[in-house]
């Protein structure tokens, strides 16, 4: 399983063209540098004939730098109390690609792999009884996840509460790439559209509600200034409860 996971990570970064981290440190609101740029093809076709030989040796460094960059950005910028009520998370759900991504973001795969390692530390008997499928576990709220483009979003709310235009395409050295956002929201066609699953309706009012997180995206404000900003996108479906009065 470990070898399979490492192969998956290598394959993932094999088709990703990351911007140099030295340039990433110098980006501002008007900068177009961004570390998570993905193209399709070999390392040689993207960066020249010498890139293939040094590509594999730099994968670990690239991955480490991208994670550090995301953590640094999360420490520098914090939403205020009013704006963070329904959008208080920092996630990596944005990808620049020439076509629709075929898999969830890499950090999602890393989380699944971590869960596998945690399960591997338990005995076979414990794992068998802890398997949600064996216990018949169901989610409290039904949700759906999909990649959407800026053409679907059009506008978004930034961390200052202002409305900005989400740019559909991002200029790169060899053309343009589209911005894709991995969104998760409550399923309007699911069985929980009338309330959360497993809640006693005699005592509680329940509702499945889509919540948002901040992600970094290329946008344009009302003054036509283009830059990378944190915007809200749908990232989860949670259950909200209120107690019934008069009982």
Swiss-Prot record:
Family, similarity comment: Belongs to the NGF-beta family.
Organism name: Equus caballus
The record's account of how the chain is modified after translation: Mature BDNF is produced by proteolytic removal of the propeptide, catalyzed by a FURIN family member. In addition, the precursor form is proteolytically cleaved within the propeptide, but this is not an obligatory intermediate for the production of mature BDNF. Can be converted into mature BDNF by plasmin (PLG).
Signal peptide as annotated in the record: 1-18
Keyword terms: Cleavage on pair of basic residues, Disulfide bond, Glycoprotein, Growth factor, Secreted, Signal
SS bonds (residue pairs): 141-208, 186-237, 196-239
Compartments where found: Secreted
Site entry: Cleavage: 57-58
Name of the protein in its database record: Neurotrophic factor BDNF precursor form
Gene from which the chain derives: BDNF
Glycosylation sites: 121
Function of the molecule: Important signaling molecule that activates signaling cascades downstream of NTRK2. During development, promotes the survival and differentiation of selected neuronal populations of the peripheral and central nervous systems. Participates in axonal growth, pathfinding and in the modulation of dendritic growth and morphology. Major regulator of synaptic transmission and plasticity at adult synapses in many regions of the CNS.
Highest classification ranks of the organism: Eukaryota, Metazoa, Chordata, Craniata, Vertebrata
Chain residues in the propeptide: 19-128
GO cellular component: extracellular region
InterPro entries: Brain-der_neurotrophic_factor (IPR020430), Cystine-knot_cytokine (IPR029034), Nerve_growth_factor-like (IPR020408), Nerve_growth_factor-rel (IPR002072), Nerve_growth_factor_CS (IPR019846)
Assembly behavior: Monomers and homodimers. Binds to NTRK2/TRKB. Can form heterodimers with other neurotrophin family members, such as NTF3 and NTF4 (in vitro), but the physiological relevance of this is not clear. BDNF precursor form: interacts with the heterodimer formed by NGFR and SORCS2. Mature BDNF has much lower affinity for the heterodimer formed by NGFR and SORCS2.
GO function terms (MF aspect): growth factor activity
PANTHER family, per the entry: BRAIN-DERIVED NEUROTROPHIC FACTOR, NERVE GROWTH FACTOR NGF -RELATED
């Amino acid at each position: 399983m470990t070898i399979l996971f490492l192969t998956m990570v290598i394959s993932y970064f094999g088709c990703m063209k990351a911007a140099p981290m030295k340039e990433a440190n110098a980006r501002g609101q008007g900068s177009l540098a961004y570390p998570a740029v993905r193209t399709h093809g070999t390392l040689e076709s993207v960066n020249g004939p010498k890139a293939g030989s040094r590509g594999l040796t730099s994968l670990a460094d690239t991955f480490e730098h991208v994670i550090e960059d995301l953590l640094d950005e999360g420490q520098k910028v914090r939403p205020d109390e009013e704006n963070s009520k329904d959008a208080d998370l920092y996630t990596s759900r944005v990808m620049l690609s020439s076509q629709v991504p075929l898999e969830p973001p890499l950090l999602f795969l890393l989380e699944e792999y971590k869960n596998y390692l945690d399960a591997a530390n338990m005995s076979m008997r414990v794992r068998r009884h802890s398997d949600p499928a064996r216990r018949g576990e169901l989610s409290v709220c039904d949700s759906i996840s999909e990649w959407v483009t800026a053409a679907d979003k059009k506008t978004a709310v930034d961390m200052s509460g202002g409305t900005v235009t989400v740019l559909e395409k991002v200029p790169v050295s060899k053309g343009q790439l589209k911005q894709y956002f991995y969104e998760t929201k409550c399923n309007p066609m699911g069985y929980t559209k009338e309330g959360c699953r497993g809640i006693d309706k005699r005592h509680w009012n329940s509702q499945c509600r889509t919540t948002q997180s901040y992600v970094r995206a290329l946008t344009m404000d009302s003054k036509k200034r283009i830059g990378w900003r944190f915007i809200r996108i749908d990232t989860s479906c949670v259950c909200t409860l209120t107690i019934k009065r008069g009982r």
